[in-house]
């Protein structure tokens, strides 16, 4: 009987650790649904668009802040952080970005390196290759708490 208790405890501990490893996988799988299209194919033609991040004098912005693309078009975003702070470029629909912004308020140090999202440090750059397979209006935003609200928001109109 004394041997059963340690074995049961070890089995429960192993199950808890396994469950802890599985939950983040499922959370990440749910994140693999992209509202604004899908990751691009580098073997196919694409247009290059540079988006510069600014945070001058307390104002935060993307330049350009609006982009029009054709459905099916691939865009290679070259994202340049010309500011003094770290910023993000998260491409999604407004609903998904607002939902993700709420998560960022809970976990403000979370960094992104996803097909549709990058964290870019000051004086650095990153790239996203994206295929806009759906019509509609989508947004790119910095979801670091307070940045979206300070103006770090742009629109992609897919026709």
Show the residue positions of the predicted features.
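Beta-strand cores of secreted/periplasmic/IMS beta-sandwich domains, seen most often
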Residues: 64-91, 126-134, 158
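Residues that flank catalytic or metal-binding motifs in active/ligand-binding sites
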Residues: 47, 73, 85, 116, ...
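Short beta-strand and strand-turn-strand segments in soluble, beta-rich domains
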Residues: 59, 105-114
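N-terminal edge beta-strand
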Residues: 43-74
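Short, compositionally biased
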Residues: 90-97, 144
């Amino acid at each position: 009987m004394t041997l059963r208790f340690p074995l049961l405890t070890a089995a429960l501990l192993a199950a808890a650790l396994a469950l802890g490893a599985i939950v983040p996988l499922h959370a990440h799988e749910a994140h693999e649904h992209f509202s604004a299209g899908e990751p691009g194919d580098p073997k196919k033609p694409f247009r290059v668009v540079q988006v510069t991040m600014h945070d001058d004098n307390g104002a935060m912005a993307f330049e350009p802040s609006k982009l029009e693309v054709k459905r099916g078009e691939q865009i290679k975003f070259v994202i340049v952080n010309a500011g003094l702070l770290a910023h993000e470029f998260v491409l999604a629909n407004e609903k998904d970005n607002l939902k993700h912004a709420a998560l960022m308020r809970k976990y403000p140090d979370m960094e992104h390196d996803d097909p549709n999202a990058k964290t870019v440090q000051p004086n650095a750059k990153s790239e996203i290759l994206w295929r806009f397979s759906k019509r509609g209006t989508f947004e790119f935003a910095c979801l670091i708490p307070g940045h979206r609200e300070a103006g770090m928001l742009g629109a992609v109109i897919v026709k």
